[in-house]
Swiss-Prot record:
Belongs to the complex I LYR family. This is LYR motif-containing protein 1. It is found in: Nucleus. It holds the Pfam family Complex1_LYR. High levels in adipose tissue. Its main location: nucleus. GO terms for cellular component: midbody; mitochondrion; nucleoplasm. It is linked to When overexpressed, may be involved in obesity-associated insulin resistance, possibly by causing mitochondrial dysfunction in adipocytes. InterPro entries: Complex1_LYR_dom (IPR008011), Complex1_LYR_LYRM1 (IPR045294), LYRM1 (IPR040330). May promote cell proliferation and inhibition of apoptosis of preadipocytes. Keywords: Nucleus. It comes from the Eukaryota.
């Protein structure tokens, strides 16, 4: 990891913690705010620790893009959780043969940048 990339990643990590410190739930209730702040902190720690040993610059760039997208989406929609995605048309084909391969391809292509680190939910 280059020095510039390292500084960018550390800056994102710090900005997430600053965001969590100032976060207010849209419901206005204190317990919701505390839960959402804790979710932000836990999610950041988990994903940064998961990706700390990456050496490929393209993968690092994808993770940085995902992080900035999740920050921007969270600030815009005022929710810390990833936005749900919907299956693409023809996404529920039979689970065998070519249908399965095309279904997996459609799901992979339709997955937005901000959900790259999340596992496939069945």
């Amino acid at each position: 990891m280059t020095t510039a990339t390292r500084q960018e990643v550390l800056g994102l990590y710090r900005s997430i913690f600053r965001l969590a410190r100032k976060w207010q739930a849209t419901s206005g209730q204190m317990e919701d705010t505390i839960k959402e702040k804790q979710y932000i902190l836990n999610e950041a720690r988990t994903l940064f620790r998961k990706n700390k040993n990456l050496t490929d610059t393209d993968l690092i760039k994808q993770c940085i893009d995902e992080c900035t997208a999740r920050i921007e989406i969270g600030l815009h929609y005022k929710i810390p959780y990833p936005r749900p995605i919907h299956l693409p048309p023809m996404g529920l084909t039979p689970l065998r043969g070519r249908g399965l391969r095309s279904q997996e391809k459609l799901r992979k292509l339709s997955k937005p940048v901000y959900l790259r680190s999340h596992d496939e939910v069945s």
